[in-house]
Regions:
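Alpha/beta-hydrolase active-site loop
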Residues: 157-160, 167, 191-212
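N-terminal cap/lid subdomain of alpha/beta-hydrolase-fold enzymes
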Residues: 37-45, 86-189, 472
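A catalytic-pocket lid/entrance helix-loop region that shapes and gates access to the active site
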Residues: 131-136, 237, 241-334
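Alpha/beta-hydrolase fold nucleophile elbow
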Residues: 216-228
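Short alpha-helix in the alpha/beta-hydrolase fold that links the catalytic acid
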Residues: 449, 463-473
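Alpha/beta-hydrolase fold catalytic core
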Residues: 316-461
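Catalytic histidine-centered segment of alpha/beta-hydrolase-like enzymes
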Residues: 490-501
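Glycine-rich nucleophile elbow surrounding the catalytic serine of serine-hydrolase chemistry
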Residues: 225-238
Length: 528
């Protein structure tokens, strides 16, 4: 059974809200009219495609998670972003899942989920990771037809409610015209939305409104972000505490960026090697001794070499001794699957792009960037980087039809607005990125706040050893190390695409939620 509701508005106010909404609709003030190619100085066309600024559709569902029946509702809709003058400047599209076969969800954990980009919709984790429905793919994550969705038997909806948020210009979220009908200029839009700190600021306001409307202030709250979404949620942790007075229980960083923690020079170059080794192992390009080891037995050996031998050698640059250079060169070649000549020509600093092109060059294949299990075919075997990203083209095969079908046909959200898998958010202001320090400070201020990092061993864009390095550097005092954890998976950037890792990563989330929930009556306090 499906129904449309004024979701989040108390019943005794719904009649007044309905009248108010009708009036606004009559005056055309509640409808965003956007033309696909409208420019900053054009008036909005009378024949533009329409999306409502503030609406919701609720559908009721039932599924099985870990073998047990779970009833839930799915709310799809839009909620405005207001400026300081209380004028709507954007509307964000979201999907909100609530378990309905529980007596009271006001104290149930709430997961607020963001993807990255910047400029990416929330589609990836929504229909492939934590949501109750996931796209049709095979057990390793490759697309299959017919496209569509299926039950996610490992979804965390059994233990937490989830809202998937699409930032401005992603999904169905859009910038709104000004009062005179013209769109804000590109510069105005960037100041409001498209930058590290602007993004954090408006999303914190939006989250506050969402939590208030849906009566979730008493719920333990968690942020989960993937890729650039980890920059977003790291900054949001402090912004929510200091500007919205909303304190969290946990932050989950999936395939994290550097979150403003610099790793340049020798560290940046050396940190790639463990990822090179994992990928070479996967493609059977290591010698028999290394290839016969399990991946999790091999990687600690490579990590130890990286920290204790490779970084010191790179730090010495052109002054490294010939003997030390030969030793390091031989070990790098052994662990990476690349030739000593190729590594030497790059002065021990091999780029990921070259690795993707060179590892299987003799077979005429290239490697995927976000997931190096995927293979591509270039026009020429020569060159220093692949022609295209094999994994991304593969993913778009299945994700694009799945989300468009699912929202319209199963969740009953119908609009002619295009669903932006990737939206126009550039140029993105990356200045003053202190999100790692923001997360550290949020943890220091909030003894309840825990952080978990999840990363795939075959991710070449945000590699797993960089993720470990970020965790190590996040709190150099070591005083909060018991609230920081790392989980690795035998897949890539979206580790949950591999069926075994979908199961394990969701279980890791369940454990993280359970362990970050303080015992009843336990105070948020540091003890001597």
């Amino acid at each position: 059974m499906r129904k449309i509701s004024l979701h989040g508005i108390p019943k005794n106010r719904r009649k007044r809200a309905s009248i108010f909404t009708f009036c606004l609709l009559t005056l055309s003030l509640c409808t965003l009219e956007l033309h696909a190619e409208v420019s900053a100085d054009q008036n909005v066309s009378a024949h533009a495609r329409n999306i409502e600024i503030d609406n919701s559709v609720v559908t009721e569902h039932e599924t099985k998670i870990l073998g047990k029946r779970v009833k839930y509702s799915a709310t799809t809709g839009t909620q405005p972003v207001w400026n300081g003058d209380s004028d709507p400047v954007a509307t964000l599209f979201y999907t909100y899942y609530q378990r309905t076969d529980v007596k009271d969800n006001t104290t149930r954990p709430l997961i607020i989920s963001f993807n990255g980009g910047p400029g990416s919709a929330s589609v990836w984790m929504h229909v492939a990771y934590t949501g109750p429905r996931i796209l049709n793919i095979d057990s390793e994550g490759y697309p299959v037809q017919p496209y569509g969705v299926q039950t996610n038997p490992y979804s965390i909806l059994d233990v937490a409610d989830i809202v998937f948020v699409n930032p401005v210009n992603t999904g169905y979220s859009r910038v709104l015209p000004k009062a005179d009908g013209t769109m804000p200029s590109k510069n105005e839009q960037q100041k409001m939305f498209f930058g590290v700190n602007a993004d954090i600021s408006y999303l914190a306001e939006w989250v506050n409104t969402f939590v208030t409307r849906n009566n979730r202030w008493r719920s333990p709250k968690y942020l989960i972000g993937e890729s650039y979404g980890t920059t977003r949620v790291s900054g949001l942790a402090l912004e929510l505490q200091n500007r919205q007075w909303m304190y969290l229980n946990g932050v989950v960083l999936v395939s994290p960026t550097d979150i403003g923690i610099e790793r340049n020079g020798p560290v940046k170059a050396a940190n790639r090697l463990p990822y090179f080794a994992a990928t070479a192992w996967y493609h059977n390009r290591l010698d028999e001794t290394l290839q016969s080891k399990d991946l999790l037995d091999l990687l600690p050996e490579v990590e130890d070499f990286t920290i204790n031998e490779l970084i010191p050698a790179l730090a010495k640059g052109g002054f490294v001794s010939e003997n030390e250079k030969r030793t390091v060169l031989a070990k790098m070649a052994r662990y990476s699957g690349l030739s000593e000549a190729a590594i030497s020509q790059n002065n021990l600093d091999v780029s990921t792009a070259f690795f993707w092109k060179d590892l299987l060059r003799d077979e005429g294949k290239t490697l995927g960037r976000l997931d190096s299990r995927y293979l591509g075919i270039d026009a020429k075997q020569s060159g220093d980087r692949p022609d295209y990203w094999a994994e991304l083209t593969s993913w778009l095969h299945s994700f694009t039809p799945a989300i468009n079908y699912y929202l319209r046909e199963e969740l009953n959200y119908k609009t002619d607005i295009k669903y932006n898998m990737f939206g126009n958010v550039h140029p993105w202001d990356r200045s003053n990125n202190n999100t790692g320090e923001n997360l550290r400070l949020a943890m220091a201020q909030n003894p309840y706040l825990n952080v978990m990092i999840q990363a795939g061993y075959y991710d070449g864009a945000t590699n797993y050893f960089d993720a470990k390095y970020t965790m190590w550097q996040l709190d150099q005092s070591g005083n909060m190390r018991d609230r920081l954890s790392f989980k690795g998976y035998r897949s890539g950037h979206m580790m949950y695409l591999r069926r075994d890792d979908l199961k394990q990563s969701n279980q890791d989330l369940r454990t993280f939620i359970a362990e970050s929930m303080p015992a009843k009556g336990e105070p948020a306090i540091y003890r001597r």
